[in-house]
Amino acid sequence: IRDSGSAAARAGVDLPDAEHLFDGDSHLLRALEESLDEANTLAIMRQNQVLPEGSHGLAYIKATGFGYLEYALEDPIGFVALIEVSSRSIVPVSFDETGETEQPFDMGKAFTFIMNLVRDAISESNGPRSPWILFTQIAALWASIHGLSQLSTVGALRYHSANFYFNLASKVMDIILQGMVNVLELKRPD
């Protein structure tokens, strides 16, 4: 999907029509990326909304992983397309930046949401306030749930049930979160 022809074909639109509507292929790809990122963010938000008010930041991170997987399972083509057309930065410029002002490159809604949750969980537990630490924890979290989502939608695990995927995701997220707690010496919720 790196080219606009593939993106237009997946959308069921002729390439000349798509390019005309979006003033060239770069605008088409950016609009596709924003639309798919919005769908991913909505799935993440749905999973986070089921948590009780005041839950520990680590619980929100786990719910975010479930939301990412939910999006991949609900729209596997959109999930793969989002990854193919992603053009945004995933590196935070500072620990305290929320993705709104200092960030020279748009991270996208879903990735900004993940970054903010990880930062908040680190802060909540008095962990180290370093952009590098923040980035490595985001990368570990994203890579783990993204890998599982890939395996579940287009990979070797694609023929299992949703229960299987979410049970496996729960275990994967628990391992990642425990690693985060151990490496950063964070406080676990009571």
Residue spans of the language-model regions?
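Hydrophobic alpha-helical connector segments
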Residues: A31, S35, M45-I77, F105-K109, ...
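Amphipathic C-terminal alpha-helical segment
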Residues: E74, D120, E124, L141-H160, ...
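The alpha-helix within a helix-turn-helix
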Residues: S4, A8
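Short coil turns linking two alpha-helices in DNA-binding domains
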Residues: R10-D14
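Helical hydrophobic small-molecule/effector-binding pocket
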Residues: K62-V91, F111-M115, I145, S149
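An amphipathic alpha-helix adjacent to DNA-recognition modules
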Residues: I1, L15, E19-M45, K62, ...
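Short, hydrophobic secondary-structure boundary micro-motifs
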Residues: V80-I83, I90-V91, G127-S130, V154-S161, ...
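Amphipathic alpha-helical packing segments from all-alpha helical-bundle domains
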Residues: S55, S89-E124, F135-A139, F166-V181
